[in-house]
Amino acid sequence: MSFLEELRSLARLYRQQFKTTFATMVQYRASLFIWMIGQVLEPLVYLIVWSTVSNGNGGSVGGYTAQGFAAYYLTLMIVNQVTYTWIMYEYEYRIRQGSLSFALLKPVHPIHSDISDNLSSKLVTLPILLVVAGLLALVFHPVAAPTVWAVLAFIPALVLAFLVRFLMEWTLALASFWTTRVSAINQVYFILMLFLSGQLVPLSLFPHWLQVLGAILPFRWMVGFPVELVLGRLTPLQALAGLAAQAAWLVISLVLVRLVWRLGVRVYSAVGA
């Protein structure tokens, strides 16, 4: 099969996956509504808490006013939605139930099905979340100072953030090849993500050593960096360094996915799955 034929095959897969995902979400509207509430409530709670702290601290905390926190968490809501994955919850079930065996029989790598499913769901949910964020903006009056170059740089930063987060979490999900109880691994990962990605609080409010740790690990580059970038809180040099860090983690993620997948499939096949 030529490269162009492979691309056409993948395009058909992604198109069909979108139709399937859209039909499923329409059918299960109540579940979608509950999930969307969860996506909105978490950053909204952080926004209310830090806005209150800011107002009680002379109007500013670490350079963030109440309106600055509003801009941060409303943008975070969107960025987190774009980069969010749920694959770590699914792989344990797939392996325990044997459904992965069917995926291995297909000529296309299973990761493509997961990517297309993830993107398809976001095409459905993101417009809803944008409307909600717009309504919340009318209440909390966010203030930011983005520049043209920052907005333009935000686009590749967001794409890289999604790719790094998806590949990293897909790699961690493959731990299910060696243990069918990965909930502890997931919990440790999500705690680190909460603190070091900027979801709980902007990383600039942390002590210096935690900021350094956040810069070394991949979590900031999955969520916090695009938020800081589009809000105009980074210099051009910091933005370039951040994009370089994202590119480096993308390469690392691709290597890890290929390596761990190859090793995991061997283990899976060896036990007669």
Region locations from a protein language model:
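Hydrophobic transmembrane alpha-helices and immediately adjacent juxtamembrane helices
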Residues: 1-273
